[in-house]
């Protein structure tokens, strides 16, 4: 053994003695080669994320205009974690959580931990305590803009508090990032949009809370309404685009299109139908949709209703979509015919 190797071994032993076993290791020893994920609750978004869902132990920022579907996207993630037997927490800084709507999206509100903090410091300290416990699988902070520093709440209306929230977020993320990674917690920060004053060229839109969250986030999702969905003259929902603006675990800039139906959340049938039509798993002839020579319905809404009433066929189509994109989370449905294959 060379003197250099002996010196390195001695240094490694001292580091492990001082900071504990596993504090330093060779990258290939115990590091996870494949990113561990939890489904987002939307097949289209799972594909856009490139790894089949939200990566564990990472920070995710979801931002967009008002009523675009940010909280809906987050609640679907909570429902998926709970479906897998995980524990979820929701820091409701906006004090606007609707338990009835959350329940309709599949969230078990009896098991969901909810906090409605008075100040930004309180909300972030509660989040840190939950993450450090190691018992939380997903935590959602709604929203960064509502994490108001204590000094601002206790001050007068006209007082100036320049950069106070940005400093608060910067300090909190420095403390949180390591704990989030070690505990394998998915931390979702919901954020709003503001406009910079006096911007003549380029995008005037920005997100509050400073730049720290942009840097610490593994994934940043931009949620925007694209168009209204109508049934006759009645507006029943919105077609929403979710753009992956930043992604450290897969190629970014992919876009997921989902139907967010009022009172129901993301329409699983709508995205499955659209994706299956693109891949020619479901054949579209005129206004008719067909699968394995079986007609699903005339028009998109009727075909969606057919898939809703026939979950076996819906799950079978979803399996082939996942298989095509290489993000197989679902196993093949038991009643799937062996002859059914994806070309």
UniProtKB/Swiss-Prot annotation:
InterPro entries tied to this protein: AAA+_ATPase, DNA_recomb/repair_RecA, DNA_recomb/repair_RecA_CS, P-loop_NTPase, RecA-like_C, RecA-like_N, RecA_ATP-bd, RecA_C_sf
Compartments (UniProt record): Cytoplasm
MF annotations from Gene Ontology: ATP binding; ATP hydrolysis activity; ATP-dependent DNA damage sensor activity; damaged DNA binding; single-stranded DNA binding
Keyword Coiled coil on entry: no
SUPFAM superfamilies tied to this protein: P-loop containing nucleoside triphosphate hydrolases, RecA protein, C-terminal domain
Coarse class of the protein's main subcellular location: cytoplasm
Keyword terms of this UniProt record: ATP-binding, Cytoplasm, DNA damage, DNA recombination, DNA repair, DNA-binding, Nucleotide-binding, SOS response
Residues that bind ATP: 64-71
Function of the protein: Can catalyze the hydrolysis of ATP in the presence of single-stranded DNA, the ATP-dependent uptake of single-stranded DNA by duplex DNA, and the ATP-dependent hybridization of homologous single-stranded DNAs. It interacts with LexA causing its activation and leading to its autocatalytic cleavage.
Family the UniProt entry places it in: Belongs to the RecA family.
Protein name listed in UniProt: Protein RecA
Species of the source: Bacillus cytotoxicus (strain DSM 22905 / CIP 110041 / 391-98 / NVH 391-98)
């Amino acid at each position: 053994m060379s003197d250099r190797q002996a010196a390195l071994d001695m240094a490694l032993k001292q580091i492990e003695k001082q900071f504990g076993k596993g504090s330093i290791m060779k990258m290939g020893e115990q590091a996870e080669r494949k990113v561990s994920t939890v489904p987002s609750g939307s097949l289209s978004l799972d594909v856009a994320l490139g790894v089949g869902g939200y990566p564990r132990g990472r920070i995710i920022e979801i931002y967009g205009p008002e009523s675009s579907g940010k909280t809906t996207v987050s609640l679907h993630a909570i429902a998926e974690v709970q479906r897998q037997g995980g524990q979820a927490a929701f820091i409701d800084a906006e004090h606007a959580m609707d338990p009835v709507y959350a329940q309709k999206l599949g969230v078990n509100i009896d098991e969901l931990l909810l906090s409605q903090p008075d100040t930004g410091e309180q909300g972030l300290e509660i989040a840190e305590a939950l993450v450090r416990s190691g018992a939380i699988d997903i935590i959602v902070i709604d929203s960064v803009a509502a994490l108001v520093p204590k000094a601002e709440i206790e001050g007068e209306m006209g007082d100036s508090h320049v950069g106070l929230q940005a400093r608060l977020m910067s300090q909190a993320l420095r403390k949180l990032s390591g704990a989030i990674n070690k505990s394998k917690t998915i931390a979702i920060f919901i954020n709003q949009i503001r406009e910079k004053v006096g911007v003549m060229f380029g995008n005037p839109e920005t997100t509050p809370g400073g730049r720290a969250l942009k840097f610490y986030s593994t994934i940043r999702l931009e949620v925007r309404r694209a168009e209204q969905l109508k049934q006759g003259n009645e507006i029943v929902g919105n077609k929403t685009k979710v753009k992956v603006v930043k992604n450290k675990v897969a190629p970014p800039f992919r876009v997921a299109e989902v139907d967010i139906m009022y009172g129901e959340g993301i329409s699983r049938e709508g995205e499955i139908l659209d994706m299956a039509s693109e891949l020619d798993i479901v054949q579209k002839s005129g206004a008719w949709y067909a699968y394995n020579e079986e007609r699903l319905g005339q028009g998109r809404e009727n075909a969606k209703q057919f898939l809703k009433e026939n979950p076996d066929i819906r799950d079978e189509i979803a399996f082939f979509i996942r298989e095509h994109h290489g993000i197989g989370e679902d196993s093949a449905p038991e009643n799937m015919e062996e002859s059914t294959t994806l070309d």
